[in-house]
């Protein structure tokens, strides 16, 4: 199985470090056949990566489960017609407070995109904003994303 993550920037953020660790471990344990990280921008990142990192223009060649980590990335990812199972990872810390456009985007996410919350606090915030539920990840692992 192929698992990819789409992030805005390759950088040393808490979320990115978790993603790097998840993909590295999944490859070592043979939980996935291929791991990919797609990005829009590159920043300094000293983390070891045992998976491919590609500019977002290469998303058109990807097939598998794609986890999108920011609302601003969904429009591009949603236009891809390959065999992609799209998952949006909602993390309260990535939302811009007071951004009405982002809130409307959150409410109108396509019903074909599965939404998962990073933690319980994010799940409560997602429900408060949208009136919809977004299950919490039991653990941040490849198996959790692949079984969606």
Which stretches of residues belong to each language-model region?
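A short, active-site helix/loop in glycosyltransferases that binds the activated sugar's phosphate group
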Residues: 76-77, 99, 111-136, 143-146
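Short, glycine/serine-rich, charged loops/turns that create anion-binding
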Residues: 10-11, 93, 120
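A structural motif corresponding to the C-terminal end of an alpha-helix
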Residues: 29-30, 108-113
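N-terminal pre-catalytic "stem/leader" segment of glycosyltransferase-like enzymes
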Residues: 1-62, 135-148
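Extended catalytic core of nucleotide-activated donor transferases of GT-like folds
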Residues: 41-110
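Hydrophobic, Leu/Ile/Phe/Ala-enriched alpha-helical segments that form helix-helix packing faces
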Residues: 22-30, 73-78, 126-130
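A structural signal for well-ordered alpha-helical scaffolds and beta->alpha junctions
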Residues: 19, 70, 119-120
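Short internal beta-strands
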Residues: 34-41, 87-89, 115-118
């Amino acid at each position: 199985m192929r698992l990819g993550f789409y992030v805005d920037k390759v950088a040393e953020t808490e979320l990115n470090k978790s993603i790097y660790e998840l993909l590295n471990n999944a490859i070592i344990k043979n939980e996935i056949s291929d791991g990919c990280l797609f990005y829009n921008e590159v920043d300094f990142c000293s983390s070891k990566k045992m998976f491919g990192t590609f500019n977002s223009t290469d998303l058109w060649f990807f097939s598998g489960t794609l986890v999108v980590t920011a609302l601003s990335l969904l429009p591009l990812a949603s236009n891809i017609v390959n065999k992609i199972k799209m998952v949006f990872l909602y993390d309260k810390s990535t939302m811009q407070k007071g951004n009405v456009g982002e809130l409307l985007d959150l409410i109108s996410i396509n019903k074909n995109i599965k939404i998962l919350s990073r933690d319980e606090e994010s799940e409560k915030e997602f429900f408060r904003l949208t009136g919809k539920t977004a299950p919490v990840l039991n653990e941040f692992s490849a198996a959790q994303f692949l079984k969606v």
